């Protein structure tokens, strides 16, 4: 018996087993995709378990209930008022990404390749106009050590505005050639669409977040015990719920014959295009979150009596647009991400009278969702090391300052302020953020 137990422990601690355990998310995702392929009626929208409610509402609500339990109310409200970060993410999510994808689709359309379906290109444009995803970017931002409070606020704001912005962008991109054939029925179902989106965002994001905040403030000891229990036993509720959300999306897509309605060449094209465009958008989001020229234009804080009034006002307005690393990670996850939970509703509502093309329209969105989660999961470890590197550097600088009794006051202030402070208060360190 002892020999068998030691053998099991040896196998469990083997390097191959450790690697498989580290990739548990993708292994579970692959299993769920296979189940969705052969039993799509189980978790699809309108299926056996009514996935649009049990998963579309229940799983997303649990994620934000968890977020509400672990976030301080004062910090949450401060992040809600961070208009600079919200403006940056909204411009990236709606305007920049959709315009770039539209340009690529025009180029592909001009190539006139018969293997690339015309309605798949419309699906790409629709995917690019969707708001940021509801669940995955919150989970990835939290795991990477980014500003999850800002991410939660952005999910609420972005999806609320997406109900109005997405249909308007679709009309703008499809009201003339070369994509006039894909223009949805103008005005049909838009009012109902707004109602559904408001209901879903309210019930799955706002209400559980509010309930979590109430529980946290009324029962702080019980909340701390619950969160400590999850942390002690490595229970990752957010990741489990995200797997179920993707399971429901794939079930809906397979049930509507989304992957069999287009050619294999088109599917391969979408896989590589989605991967490349997501990585490109992540890099673009980094450039928007930490533009190098701001440090060149504003190398130091305004000096009383020496700096001009123009420099002082310009510094206060533009310098906070160079975000901290925590906020930058949130921007890099929220900017390129596109929601499938609300995206399916946005697409089906606009193309309700074109059911024969609905499967083709959903293919780019479903594939983009799984690829963005896989790629973002890879970025988590990179971003975490990026933050930890500065945390270690700040710690070494602080210890050196304590040993030296005659330390420059300016240096002490810069260390005390810290890189990791959010830009919400607009108290920007004198030293340049790393």
Swiss-Prot record:
Record keyword Cell membrane present: yes
Induction of synthesis: Expression is positively regulated by calcium/calcineurin signaling through the sole CDRE element (5'-TTAGCCTC-3') in its promoter.
Location in or out of the cell: Cell membrane; Bud neck
GO molecular function, one term: monocarboxylic acid transmembrane transporter activity
Recorded topology in the membrane: Multi-pass membrane protein
Pfam families in alphabetical order: SBF_like
Keyword annotations from UniProtKB, A to Z: Calcium, Calcium transport, Cell membrane, Ion transport, Membrane, Phosphoprotein, Transmembrane, Transmembrane helix, Transport
Stretches in topological domain Extracellular: 37-50, 109-118, 171-199, 256-264, 349-362
Signal peptide: none
Cytoplasmic topology ranges: 1-15, 72-87, 140-149, 221-234, 286-327, 384-434
Residues the record lists as Phosphoserine modifications: 425
Top-rank taxon, per record: Eukaryota
GO cellular component, one term: cellular bud neck
GO biological process terms, semicolon-separated: calcium ion transport; negative regulation of cytosolic calcium ion concentration
Role noted for this protein: Solute carrier protein that negatively regulates the cytosolic calcium homeostasis in response to high levels of extracellular calcium.
Family (UniProt): Belongs to the bile acid:sodium symporter (BASS) (TC 2.A.28) family.
Descriptive protein name: Solute carrier RCH1
Species in which this protein is naturally found: Saccharomyces cerevisiae (strain ATCC 204508 / S288c) (Baker's yeast)
